[in-house]
Curated annotation (Swiss-Prot):
Zinc found in the keyword field: no
Species this chain originates from: Pelodictyon phaeoclathratiforme (strain DSM 5477 / BU-1)
One of the GO BP terms on file: cobalamin biosynthetic process
NCBIfam families: cobQ, PRK00784.1
Name the record gives this protein: Cobyric acid synthase
Keyword field: Cobalamin biosynthesis, Glutamine amidotransferase
Length: 503
């Protein structure tokens, strides 16, 4: 068991399956505990996601743990997500170990021997438990994948190592909640089942009173208390973990609603950092559509090519489906096109991968909408950055995560004047803008999180656009989330589980 220099507690949030809401439950508890005066930090031993972010000291971790750290009001560190797997094919992923790129592994190769990853995860957990009063541990997928159980260091092995009590989260919205909970508990070894101290039923729709007997039945069948039934709620804008959120409009039958600012984003097979678009998705003046399949883009004001973990592969996919013709037609009609990171690279002339960073070495012809040449290099750029959108007063801030180095010709103007990276002064240029200002690209993720950039961009699409007088900031969203969960959880029992007094 991990030994801390002071009395430390761990609470593990495990799931009956993937996407049952573990991340959002952990985020809510981080803010609830912090509001109660507890020094709390998040932890997830291994995350599989192309939605990552950069810590203040230049390390890459899952976006979910950055969000949880913000909710806990602590500085995010690599120890909060020591192993990050970034899928770049159907069977392989880049491994980021304690914040830095380590290797590229096939699924079979990764699971052949997990001792290196497990030891790094243990070291990080030990450091967190030495620094913080409570560590909220998020599990991965189902905590009861019995065919992988002996190699799973993310769920119950972490709980045993930290001495954590476990709360099991089930998603009633997908149906079969009794099977989820009872089935999960039934297959667990007795020593691990004994660690489960409570159950949370997530995403309930309708009148909770109608499920009171369901709660009693679950408690009778399992002998474990149900700590809360959480109603489905969309009133907060908090980044999703590793997939475009279920609320997103993907390949809708029609175009954008009349009166809305229509924005289309190409939904690449290896889309990354889709949370770059969250501020647009949550703006009531905007209708954002994620599109897999080519269609006429008439009715949309802008097309966004988001990030990609396999840029050349996704570019080949784009060509194979016939997207190029629709993109060029949209360009010819005066539509505004923006590329972010990998999407920016696709807007250039070519993408060269001489070292086979994303697969086979080679060069792929790009869309040639910006006069830019990109080479994928072996070293990854990881930075939090600030600057100004050139020619405007919009203050840009975001983060960079890319292997590419792009050279911009004089036919384009730079997009952003970078004034700082990782809190060090800089005077550099980022991105490119076409001569008519209708095509642009940048390496900055989270550009639209900055209200001045969002105002500038949407004003290009609709001159009458104005930001809402009161847009929910991230901290306000965490408070709304904490209030929502607090109203439906038995906090006295939860504080008792972590041996703390709830006041």
């Amino acid at each position: 068991m991990v030994k801390a220099e002071h009395e430390s507690r761990a609470l593990a949030i495990f799931g009956t399956a993937s996407d049952v809401g573990k991340s959002i439950v952990a985020t809510a508890l981080c803010r609830i505990f912090n509001n109660a005066g507890i020094d709390v930090a998040p932890y997830k031993a291994q995350n599989m996601s192309n939605n990552s972010g950069v810590t203040p000291d230049g390390c890459e971790i899952g976006r979910a743990q950055i969000v949880q750290a913000e909710a806990a009001r602590v500085v995010p560190t690599a120890d909060m997500n020591p192993v990050l797997l970034k899928p770049n094919s159907d069977t392989g992923a880049q491994v980021v170990l304690q914040g830095k790129v380590c290797s590229t592994e096939t699924a079979k190769g990764y699971f052949r021997d997990t001792s290196l990853w497990a030891e790094a995860a243990r070291e990080s957990l030990e450091r967190l438990m030495k620094r913080h009063e409570v560590v909220v541990i998020e599990g991965a997928g189902s905590c009861a994948e019995m065919n992988l159980y002996d190699r799973d260091f993310v769920n119950f092995r972490t709980a045993r190592l930290s001495g954590a009590s476990v709360i099991l989260v089930a998603d009633i919205d997908r149906g079969g909640v009794f099977g989820q909970v009872v089935g999960t508990l039934a297959v667990l070894p007795a020593e691990d089942r004994a660690l489960v101290k409570g159950v949370i039923i997530n995403r309930f729709r309708g009148d909770i009173d109608l499920f009171r007997d369901g709660v009693e039945m679950l408690e009778s069948m399992t002998g474990i208390p149900v700590l809360g039934v959480i109603p489905y709620f969309r009133g907060f804008a908090i980044d999703a973990e590793d997939a475009v959120p279920l609320s997103a409009k993907v390949d809708p039958a029609g175009g954008p609603e009349e009166g809305k600012i229509g924005v289309a984003a190409i939904y690449f097979p290896h889309i990354s950092n889709f949370t770059d678009l969250s501020p647009l998705e949550h703006d009531p003046a905007v209708e954002l559509h994620y599109l897999h399949y080519p269609r006429s883009l008439k009715g949309y004001k802008a097309l966004i090519l988001p990030g990609s973990k396999n840029v050349r592969g996704d570019l080949a996919w784009l060509y194979s489906l016939g997207w190029e013709a629709e993109i060029r037609a949209f360009r010819a009609e005066g539509g505004i096109i923006m590329g972010i990171c990998g999407g920016y690279q696709m807007l250039g002339n070519s993408i060269a991968d001489p070292y086979g960073v994303e697969g086979s070495a080679g060069t792929t012809k790009a869309l040639a909408l910006l006069d830019v040449e990109t080479v994928l290099e072996q070293d990854k750029c990881l930075a939090n950055a600030r600057g100004t959108v050139i020619g405007t007063s919009a203050e840009a801030s975001g983060y960079e995560i890319h292997m590419g180095r792009s050279v911009v010709s004089d036919l384009c103007t730079p997009f952003i004047r970078v004034t700082a990276r990782n809190n060090r002064p800089e005077d550099e240029l980022d991105g490119a803008v076409s001569s008519d200002g209708r095509v642009m690209g940048s390496y900055f993720h989270a550009l639209f999180d900055e209200s001045s950039v969002k105002q500038w961009f949407l004003s290009l699409l609709e001159p009458s656009y104005r930001l809402q007088k009161h847009e929910k900031g991230r901290q306000e969203s965490y408070e709304l989330l904490a209030d929502h969960f607090s109203s439906h959880l038995d906090l006295n029992k939860i504080f008792t589980i972590i041996d703390k007094v709830h006041s």
